[in-house]
């Protein structure tokens, strides 16, 4: 984690915690792919599996935060931050079908399901509860960015 600054570590911790809804201290390899893709990292499933195999030091098939952060560090750099923000803004705009500055909780659930079909309804509800801070039933760009960047 030497190559990550404090803000990046916090953002990764928040993303990790959002998907570790049962507080087990680990996430699945599939979830790693979901988080990286949501953060704008373009990676093939095959390359992702190779990187996860290298990173899952204890061979448990479960990715602890330290392992996840080490893996993510390979893909994140400060120069990428602006590009990441731009990509996230574009992704948000695509899903903001009405162009009104927000997406519905239902749309966010669809996005998350599309990214990881193993998420249960309880997992999704936990993520939504954390993201929709004002309980409005909609996710504005700032809430979306907080979810993605911490």
Swiss-Prot record:
One of its GO terms (cellular component) is myosin II complex. Ca(2+) 1 binds at residues 56, 58, 60, 62, 67. GO terms for molecular function: calcium ion binding. Residues 7-42, 43-78, 83-118, 119-150 form the EF-hand domain. The modification N-acetylmethionine is found at residue 1. Pfam families: EF-hand_7 (PF13499). Ca(2+) 2 binds at residues 132, 134, 136, 138, 143. Keywords: Acetylation, Calcium, Metal-binding, Muscle protein, Repeat. Belongs to the troponin C family. This protein binds two calcium ions. Troponin is the central regulatory protein of striated muscle contraction. Tn consists of three components: Tn-I which is the inhibitor of actomyosin ATPase, Tn-T which contains the binding site for tropomyosin and Tn-C. The binding of calcium to Tn-C abolishes the inhibitory action of Tn on actin filaments. This is Troponin C, isoform 1.
């Amino acid at each position: 984690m030497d190559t990550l600054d404090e803000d990046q570590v916090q953002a990764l911790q928040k993303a990790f915690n959002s998907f570790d809804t049962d507080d087990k201290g680990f996430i699945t390899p599939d979830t790693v792919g979901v988080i990286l893709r949501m953060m704008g990292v373009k990676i093939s499933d095959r390359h992702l599996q190779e990187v996860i195999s290298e990173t899952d030091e204890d061979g448990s098939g479960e990715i602890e935060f330290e392992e996840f952060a080490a893996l993510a560090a390979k893909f994140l750099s400060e120069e990428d931050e602006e590009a990441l923000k731009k990509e996230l803004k574009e992704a948000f705009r695509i899903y903001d079908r009405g162009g009104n500055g927000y997406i519905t909780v239902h749309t966010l659930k669809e996005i998350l399901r599309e990214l990881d079909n193993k998420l249960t309804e309880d997992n999704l509800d936990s993520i939504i509860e954390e993201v929709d801070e004002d309980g409005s039933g909609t996710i504005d760009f700032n809430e979306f960015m907080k979810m993605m960047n911490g």
